[in-house]
Amino acid sequence: MSAATACASPAAARPPLHIPLRSPPSAAHLPSAAASRRASSAACRCTASASASASPSTWDWTRWTRHFADVDQAESYASLLKFQLEEAVDNEDFAEASKLKKAILEATGNDAVAQVMSELKTAIEEQRYQDASRLTKLARTNLVGWWVGYAKDTDDSIGRIVRISPGVGRYVAKSFSPRQLVTASSGTPLFEIFLVRDDDETYTMKVVHMRPTKGTSSASSVSSATAESPAKEENESSLESSAISEGITDEANTDTTLKGDEDVEDKEQDVGNAKDSSVEGLKSVLNFFKSRIPEFKVQVINVDVSEEAELASDSSEELVQDDVKSTSENSLEDSTTEELQQDDVPDGDSDSAEDSKSPEMKLFISGVVHNKEDAGAKSYVRVPAEINNLEKDSFELYIPGKGSDRDLADTKAAKQKVADMAAKLASELMPSDVAKALWGTTKSSSKINKEVQELLKLTLSKARVKLTENTIFNRIITDSNGSDPFSGLYVGAFSPYGPEVVQLRRKFGHWNSTDEVEFFEYVEAVKLTGDLSVPAGQITFRAKIGKGKRLENRGAYPEEFGVIASYKGQGRIAQPGFKNPRWVDGELLVLNGKSTIPHLGGAELGFLYSVPEQSFLVLFDRLKLPE
């Protein structure tokens, strides 16, 4: 049997690994250090023989597939040895630990990525910058870091935040939704870049896209449940459900897992413990605005980071704070909400028909709740991909054949359908007057059924990990120390469909194109992840922050708000599909992050959109990306 044939069956060269999914292997099933060394030596000989038979630059897809399997098995084997090493150290068996360290080095001896990163670190420490530059060019180490990707030449409103990090034999790219970033999730596999070192000390890269396998995603189960359920709504809802189902069944969504009753009980207990202080703080704020604004009204939306949030309001006078879980059960009402509704709703204002005609000023607060992450195991299949136009801070990911999955016209029609439904659903999840001001939509007479709502939310969430044929990635460069409030990443909620990430930057210039312009210093916030109203890559708000631009806010806001500075600015609103975008007056608030008011605690920035007859306050928490 030739060396190449031997490598085609890596299981014959190494003992099979049986690693439990939920618990580490017991000591009785762990291989000894001697067996580990024999197995890793066999693996090294197999890889070396295969490398000698042909240069990696000439490998076909079949040969690369065998290499992928070898790397996967080597990674699993090294993980097993590391677990055994930890156990040996805990048992103070240092002789066995020393043997295991050598076995780990042998098992990962051909890890080109680990070798390159080690050599690069040494070169930088020794100030050998020419060598470091050479390694960067040969092994593409500059791919490591945080990136934001946007679809090329297509109408794509959702940006993708991606982290590329060194792995065993490859660079691993994972996509992160805003919720996953806030909850420190492990992310969703997106693509991989395998690296092989040639005999002439050059490197060969192979890029693969991690495509979710059909039939294993939550999307499939949700679509199936919808199709089998009895038709209880109008035909329009059935058609909407079918249209969305067809648009999401071919991709995986790792963010749709069910929460148990234990999480709900823990949350209710936490709310009860903080009830007294938070309720009193919010009441004082409401009383403050009521004393200064005639017939003041306030509504609060709570956007849950771990699940999509749903706002149910029967009257525009009610203060609502509902956390809606993505399950088939009914919404669970927060106990704090009930007390606030009873105490703070003005008498005689329960008529919703009269409210729709009322011209009073109202304030709508959008906040973010940080709950734990739910993870779901998914399976993926590797398909060929390419990286083109690689620069220092940008590159293009190309997936051959991805554009032919569907007809372009059908894709645009499906996106327009989703946008129209999102606008319709927003009028049900948000107060109708707020939805009309921010989304340009009114409440529909036909109600969207629960299944369609879940599918729509699933579609919007899944879009963050779905790649088109061509995706442009730009490096995310942020202020590392986070001392400047007008520079860096923030997470906030602009709609009931979940949080979004914005990047703030200081700039100097002007906001119009007339000849007589005034140059000034300002800050602008660009959406890294967008929605169907204002897409990713667009400026969502801006404010003048130069000398003399700070407003006198003494007494303008209650102390419970924690406002330490405020600046005049402009916010951008638009209808779904970024139709009819326009700027409205606004105010940028710098907060101390110590407020005891619900939804304000921890927030460091806020932007107040002044829409006619409606003020919309978006709160932002600082987001620090892991190094």
Swiss-Prot record:
Q: Where is the composition biased (Acidic residues)?
A: 308-321, 331-353
Record bears the keyword Chloroplast: yes
* GO biological process terms held by the UniProt record: response to singlet oxygen; singlet oxygen-mediated programmed cell death
Record key words, sorted: Chloroplast, Plastid, Stress response, Transit peptide
Q: Disordered: where is this region?
A: 1-34, 212-277, 308-359
Its domain of life reads Eukaryota
**Pfam families cross-referenced by the UniProt entry:** Cyclin_D1_bind
Q: Which GO terms describe its cellular component?
A: chloroplast; thylakoid membrane
Cellular location(s)? Plastid, Chloroplast
Q: Where is the transit peptide?
A: 1-45
Comp. bias regions, Low complexity? 217-229
What is known about what this protein does? Answer: Together with EX1, enables higher plants to perceive singlet oxygen as a stress signal in plastid that activates a genetically determined nuclear stress response program which triggers a programmed cell death (PCD). This transfer of singlet oxygen-induced stress-related signals from the plastid to the nucleus that triggers genetically controlled PCD pathway is unique to photosynthetic eukaryotes and operates under mild stress conditions, impeding photosystem II (PSII) without causing photooxidative damage of the plant.
Mind telling me what this protein is named? Answer: Protein EXECUTER 2, chloroplastic
Q: Which organism is it from?
A: Oryza sativa subsp. japonica
